[in-house]
């Protein structure tokens, strides 16, 4: 596959999502699968109540179809990596779907309990790990930009679980404003696609990553402010699990912290807020995750989103430079 094939991958995923949306969004609306907005959230968000959610189903469908079509055109073909990535995407997407369904259809605001969600996340991560090890996958981790490497043996299983659970939750936390996650995730997956194509190389993972980029760009047409649909936990958990799986397959476990810098910052803002409030009774931020803090400072939603996109782009460029440029 050449660069034309990579461009076609993005276009195919984009078109599938764009063409599905005018059919699927009204379908979600007829089912009354509307987003409920937290009362303690910014007041400007209350008008979003009832906006169709679970749009992540379109993203997942587009990624799977595009990946299978385009991966078959690579020299590697549809190998175990493709099926592993699809498994993770579908598995975490299913977990998110159950969470969303309980919220919107069964009218339980909290969805799955934290223990139920964590259990599902760990099980999927463990299956992913054992399949990797069965394929003879190395337990060595590499320090980006250096010659340093460490074989961590059985502890690699713990690392995989931590990464997949952590990434899925971090990405989920970032999904709080119109277009915020779709844009930052598209940038992050794009960075991994560049590294997979030019740096590693691993063309199958590059194709999957670009399928995600195309699907997210198509979703942005309907998710940018004012959003006509939300991806819900169905999409955010799937994307978080997938980006962790990609970084593991490419042996870029540490680099995920940089390329996914926006997700890391959003998560840290929540952790800092909770620790500060529990220990001192005071809040560091007006509200967490961090994007809500800037909203309450008076920033428009679009300004917050575009600023986070730019920050995400800087993190992505730094990650690509460390792995490919150096």
Swiss-Prot record:
EC number(s) given by UniProt: 2.7.8.13
S-adenosyl-L-methionine recorded as keyword: no
Subcellular localization(s) per the UniProt record: Cell membrane
Cofactor names: Mg(2+)
Keyword Calcium attached: no
Pathway listed: Cell wall biogenesis; peptidoglycan biosynthesis
Principal EC category: transferase
Transmembrane intervals: 5-25, 51-71, 82-102, 122-142, 148-168, 180-200, 204-224, 229-249, 252-272, 304-324
Highest taxon above the source species: Bacteria
Topology term for the membrane: Multi-pass membrane protein
UniProt GO cellular component terms: plasma membrane
Catalytic activity as recorded in UniProt: UDP-N-acetyl-alpha-D-muramoyl-L-alanyl-gamma-D-glutamyl-meso-2,6-diaminopimeloyl-D-alanyl-D-alanine + di-trans,octa-cis-undecaprenyl phosphate = di-trans,octa-cis-undecaprenyl diphospho-N-acetyl-alpha-D-muramoyl-L-alanyl-D-glutamyl-meso-2,6-diaminopimeloyl-D-alanyl-D-alanine + UMP
Family statement drawn from the similarity comment of this UniProt entry: Belongs to the glycosyltransferase 4 family. MraY subfamily.
Protein function: Catalyzes the initial step of the lipid cycle reactions in the biosynthesis of the cell wall peptidoglycan: transfers peptidoglycan precursor phospho-MurNAc-pentapeptide from UDP-MurNAc-pentapeptide onto the lipid carrier undecaprenyl phosphate, yielding undecaprenyl-pyrophosphoryl-MurNAc-pentapeptide, known as lipid I.
Stated name of the protein: Phospho-N-acetylmuramoyl-pentapeptide-transferase
Gene name of the record: mraY
């Amino acid at each position: 596959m050449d660069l034309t094939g990579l461009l076609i991958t993005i276009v195919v995923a984009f078109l599938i999502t764009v063409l599905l949306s005018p059919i699927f969004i009204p379908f979600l609306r007829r089912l009354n699968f509307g987003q409920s907005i937290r009362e303690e959230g910014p007041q400007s968000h209350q008008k979003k109540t009832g906006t169709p959610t679970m749009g992540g189903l379109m993203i997942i469908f587009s990624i799977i179809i595009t990946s299978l079509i385009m991966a078959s055109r690579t020299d590697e073909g549809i190998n175990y990596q493709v099926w592993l990535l699809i498994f993770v995407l579908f598995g975490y997407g299913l977990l998110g779907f159950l969470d969303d369904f309980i919220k919107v259809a069964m009218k339980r605001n909290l969805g799955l309990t934290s223990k139920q969600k964590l259990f599902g996340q760990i099980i999927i991560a463990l299956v992913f790990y054992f399949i990797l090890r069965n394929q003879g996958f190395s337990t060595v981790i590499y320090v980006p930009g250096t010659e340093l490497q460490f074989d961590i043996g059985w502890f690699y299983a713990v690392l995989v679980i931590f990464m997949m659970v952590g990434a899925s939750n971090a990405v989920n936390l970032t999904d709080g404003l119109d277009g915020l996650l779709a844009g930052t995730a598209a940038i992050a997956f794009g960075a991994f696609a560049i590294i997979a194509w030019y740096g590693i190389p691993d063309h199958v993972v590059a194709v999957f990553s670009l399928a995600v980029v195309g699907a997210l760009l198509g979703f942005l047409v309907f998710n940018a402010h004012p959003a006509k649909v939300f991806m819900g936990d169905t999409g955010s958990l799937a994307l978080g699990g997938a980006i962790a799986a990609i970084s593991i397959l490419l042996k870029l476990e540490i680099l995920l912290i940089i390329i996914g810098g926006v997700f890391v910052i959003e998560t840290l803002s929540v952790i800092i807020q909770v620790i500060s409030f529990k220990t001192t009774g005071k809040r560091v931020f007006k509200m967490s995750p961090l994007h809500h803090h800037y909203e309450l400072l008076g920033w428009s939603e679009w300004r917050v989103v575009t600023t986070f996109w730019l920050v995400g782009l800087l993190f992505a460029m730094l990650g690509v430079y460390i792995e490919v440029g150096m």
